[in-house]
Amino acid sequence: MAVINSGFGNRRGASNSRLPPGQTLVDDWPVLTAGLTPDIGAHEWTFTITTETGTEHGWDWNALQNVGVEDIVTDIHCVTHWSKLDMAWRGVSLDRLFEDVETSCDYVMVRSHGGYTTNLPLDDLLDGQAWIATEAEGEPLTPEHGGPARLLVPHLYFWKSAKWVREIRMMPSDEPGFWEQNGYHLRGDPWREERYW
């Protein structure tokens, strides 16, 4: 089981060393969505990594489960100032999914069912930092929380953990996704308060 903790000590008066600046702890898990909630069943869900040459590496639900699901306990931090600590997740590490992907790109665009996009540096998805999550707190992800599968990138603000994930497309240069086009920071590190431009 992977246990991730991004804390670096008390920063600017935070009462909890695991709480980034400007964040407030919550016990519940707020639902925030930019649009309508897609209804995608696990039987119809697919996920693709597309390289800059157009080569596609794809998985359906069963194939994803066979890659190797792992347990993760981590903190999540939303740009709207809430944090939830010690969330239990199950998912597949992107390290496993990228094993056979050949690319010279440094950036990706994550695409979701419903049209949502978010950009990330490839380095933020590898080395045990990101997963395709299928469960949270011991239950399958509900549609409201991105089910059947969402990206989980807990070291960045939670808008980078795209719900209803369907594709990661490699990009040679950084391009803004949905929220990034609307004033959100290109990277979104909560410890640096990278909320907006």
Where are these regions (language model features)?
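Structured, non-membrane catalytic/scaffold regions adjacent to prosthetic-group chemistry
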Residues: 2-197
